[in-house]
Regions:
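Short, glycine-/aromatic-enriched active-site segment of Class I SAM-dependent methyltransferases
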Residues: 148-166
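A short acidic, Gly/Pro-enriched loop at the edge of an enzyme's catalytic core
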Residues: 103-114
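Class I SAM-dependent methyltransferase Rossmann-like catalytic core
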Residues: 10-27
Length: 252
């Protein structure tokens, strides 16, 4: 879809607004990534990039009660959702919410102990993200991104079509090579579980998709956008063995 088209953008967010999270992931994956990261400083400074409505932000705040978290996203309604949820959870005083562009970050070098980015590094390019964000980490800081990867060679054309918007998508070994080439030590990695996709993302998304379809019936632009979202869900349901998100935990 074309986010520059106001009608398509409105239809997309008619489904995605008020979601608990904006991509595959869950608390269990946050716990595992933090385990791989190992001990952090006593009061770590964390940057959560493309935080969306903040499902993982709140998990980080809960699991790291002494952390100071900067949560950045380019879509203001998601940030309002995060603010409300953080206030309800009693952690708003430890989260700085920033409306900004992860491709143009305003932070000084060595500002953070941990940079987190679930499901969004590919938007600016995985290599670009690895290079740009490294300078923001303090010595022995950790970068924890998730990156879409092929899990099997030679995926069918129908599966590749699902990811046509990301032609640079590679396999697990390639993602590791890119990280090593940028001078990171790989502390560990793992592929997100099916529950991280279905239970915590596509399940809520399908519920909202049904409601939006009834509300937007008769609007051809909206119906095309909803069909694209539905196709994404169906692709994952049909071909989960061919692709996934790799959660990498990298030491600078």
């Amino acid at each position: 879809m074309d986010f520059a088209d106001p009608a398509q953008r409105a239809a997309f967010f008619a489904v995605h607004n008020d979601m608990p999270r904006e991509g595959p992931g869950d608390r269990a994956s946050v716990v595992e990534a933090l385990r791989l990261a190992g001990p952090l400083p006593a009061r770590p400074d964390i940057l959560d990039l493309a935080c969306g409505p903040g499902g993982q932000t709140l998990d980080l705040a809960d699991l790291l009660p002494d952390a100071r978290i900067t949560a950045l996203d380019g879509y203001a309604p998601f940030l309002r959702d995060l603010e409300a949820r953080a206030r309800k959870a009693g952690v708003l005083d430890r989260i700085s919410i920033v409306h900004g562009d992860m491709a143009r970050l305003p932070y000084a070098p060595q500002s953070f102990d941990l940079i987190w980015c679930e499901g969004a590094a590919y938007i600016i390019g995985f290599d670009t993200a690895l290079a740009a964000w490294k300078s923001l980490l303090r010595p022995r800081g950790v970068l924890a991104p998730t990156e879409p990867v092929w899990l099997k060679p030679d995926p069918p054309a129908s599966v590749r079509a699902c990811w046509a918007a990301y032609p640079a998508m590679e396999d697990v070994a390639s993602a590791r090579r890119h990280a090593a080439a940028h001078g990171y030590d790989i502390l560990g990695d793992f592929v997100l579980s099916d529950a991280a996709w279905q239970t915590h993302y596509y399940g809520p998304l399908e519920t909202r998709l049904g409601a939006a379809a009834a509300r937007l019936a008769g609007d051809p632009v909206a119906e095309a956008v909803l069909a694209e979202i539905r196709g994404e869900i169906e692709c994952r349901r049909a071909y989960p063995e061919y692709y996934g998100y790799l959660f990498l935990v990298l030491r600078a």
